[in-house]
Amino acid sequence: MYPPCSLYVSKHFNLSFRSNFHISIASVDEHNNPTVTPIGSLLLNDNQTGFYFEKYPKKLPIHAEGNPNVCVLGVNSSTLFWLKSLFKNKFKEYPGIKLYGQLGAKRKATEHETKRLQRRMKATKLLKGNAYLWCHMQYVRDISFTKAEKINLGDMTDHL
């Protein structure tokens, strides 16, 4: 599999965000119950790390205190991507990738990180909800990734 945050993985997560406007981060609570949190602000770096803006998640930061291990799932949900794949009975790229890693500490976002988020949200800049959701994002939480895993769908992904 590809190293976490390789060019291919970064491209896949960008496509996943474009088709879903979020990725999913799985964590476990204090009773070892799994839970999934949708995150719309995950950005990957090129050194097997990433970060997300932590304005809305409430449970994920609590889970990080007891168990910082997470699994990040990015799925390309583009209708055209899926229809082409179903028509041809094969995918040209993996439909999903999971990244395994650990959450770091919450910290103040840098100006560069804030600009990266603004660039990602540029397409929704003129919409009312953009200001509500994406303005005043001040804090990020780092994630260091240890492993990337492709999502296999039998014969449709065997050739990849």
Language-model segments: which ranges?
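Binding-site signature for planar aromatic cofactors or substrates
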Residues: 1-160
